[in-house]
């Protein structure tokens, strides 16, 4: 039996930007009727490679073959003509148009007689393409009435109208519920059966092993290898991605606990927290687990002063404090890293340095009330080095950094204020495995230095691996607390769903 021809073959692809070589002699293969995972840490070059394939960027060197024939991708239009479509993490549907108008946007069907758009034909063809992916939605509905999962189906149907043979999906389940994710997997299976090659980018390992057939790995802008999914496990895949074996994903450090740092008594807020009481010591990481909507983030935001408490007391170092707003919390040494770093944690249009000192500008005021840029720059460079922020310089826009490095910048912003209590909400969401371990090591260092840390996470292995104690919330209340040595996923989930033994 002869060797099968891949649907897609990229050979020797290189791409440079000013000051950085993003891709260096990268190769990639994907087969029709298969789902190929494209893996790598943030900054490995995945997005750049896919932007070259989909016509957003032009390659400096290299060749692209589709079914053995070399093609020249000069732009988005030529990529689509070659049968290549990308479905971005941020969906590009237009909410003010109907489903059929979105599906055929730029490719409308016109009446032979009037020259006007043939709405009836658009609706009929839209229904046909939607049925092909098992989606039963009225094509006349406005896209604004759809949920995220349904909007994603519109993007996939749109790809089919362009005779897509290769569909790239970039972090497709990030904003989906569990039910929507399962529906997407069914659609991917239907596409696969049609002979379409799917390139699937995700940080979620469980998804890779569930739906993918092969994996292609990039590391530091270079090709790091490929494998059949059946031939590798989680540890081998991580080793390919980071270039080293991660024996221990969660480097827990046991340190001596200090005095009581934070005490919360009977705290409530109208956003959903009901009578929460707990303590936190210096040199301790308190993990908070719970299902979505359990009140974890609301509790954090109430302590931080973003939400107004309706009852309860907060004490710091044994003395009651009054927190009515965020500045009250910051002035008392309480800082909060939001679960949504792009919307609430940083300003994407500002530089790394500007984001770092944003909350601490008064420190750099001279007697003329202007900024002492030299002193500011010294502190910025210190933290860039101290917590290993990978950036060309402090002037780089934070939006150009990987998720892990953005998180480090936000952490540095708060560390510059020397907080006593640090609340971190979903600290490694959307961050690759290598950067995760760096964040964990950093939290361990902060704990060892006497900081009191609250870590909210939906990742149970993370909560179990890093925390000294675990507090579980359910429906706005604290449903239980577990010591590190007695906690496991089952005991946490029982408390999370309200089963108290």
Curated annotation (Swiss-Prot):
What is the protein's major site of localization?
membrane
Enzyme class at the top of the EC tree:
translocase
**UniProt: ATP binding residues:** 40-47
Per the UniProt record, which EC number(s) apply here? Answer: 7.5.2.7
Which intervals hold domain ABC transporter?
8-245, 255-500
InterPro entries, per database record: AAA+_ATPase, ABC_carbohydrate_import_ATPase, ABC_transporter-like_ATP-bd, ABC_transporter-like_CS, P-loop_NTPase
Q: Which UniProt keywords apply?
A: ATP-binding, Cell membrane, Membrane, Nucleotide-binding, Repeat, Sugar transport, Translocase, Transport
Would the keyword Membrane turn up in this protein's UniProt record? yes
Q: Which SMART domains match?
A: AAA (SM00382)
Compartments, as annotated in UniProt: Cell membrane
Query: What membrane topology does the annotation report for this chain?
Result: Peripheral membrane protein
Which reaction equations make up its catalytic activity? D-ribose(out) + ATP + H2O = D-ribose(in) + ADP + phosphate + H(+)
Q: Which GO terms describe its cellular component?
A: plasma membrane
Oligomeric and partner information: The complex is composed of an ATP-binding protein (RbsA), two transmembrane proteins (RbsC) and a solute-binding protein (RbsB).
| Task of the protein | Part of the ABC transporter complex RbsABC involved in ribose import. Responsible for energy coupling to the transport system.
Q: Could you tell me what this protein is called?
A: Ribose import ATP-binding protein RbsA
Give the originating organism.
Clostridium perfringens (strain 13 / Type A)
**Gene name tied to this protein:** rbsA
